[in-house]
């Protein structure tokens, strides 16, 4: 685990998805950011449920990946980190990209917290583009 909490979350989910694991354990160094991103994924239907787990004074978020009904394995979600510590990417609300014509989501960090592209457009605020999920 490095210093980039968001990249660690995305990498943990992507690795669990590639290994066809049902659950993923996300280390929460910054519990607020981790919880907000996982709650967005839960609300948008990319994961099924999430629970907090504490072990030796360390907090973990245990997330269950969403599975297909008639086939084994999880849905293939593509998660891509956009803004990173070495290169920050910002956008106003009018220029927030639409992923797959609105089928995917963009997670942004705004002055009002972490939210999706749809919420940011409705509120008329822009921010730092954290990642794309489709």
Curated annotation (Swiss-Prot):
Xref: InterPro entries: Ribosomal_uS8, Ribosomal_uS8_CS, Ribosomal_uS8_sf
GO biological process, any: translation
Keywords in alphabetical order: Chloroplast, Plastid, Ribonucleoprotein, Ribosomal protein, RNA-binding, rRNA-binding
Main location: plastid
Pfam family, one: Ribosomal_S8
Regions that span the bilayer: none
Record HAMAP family: Ribosomal_uS8_B
Record family assignment: Belongs to the universal ribosomal protein uS8 family.
Subunit description: Part of the 30S ribosomal subunit.
Name listed for the protein in its UniProt record: Small ribosomal subunit protein uS8c
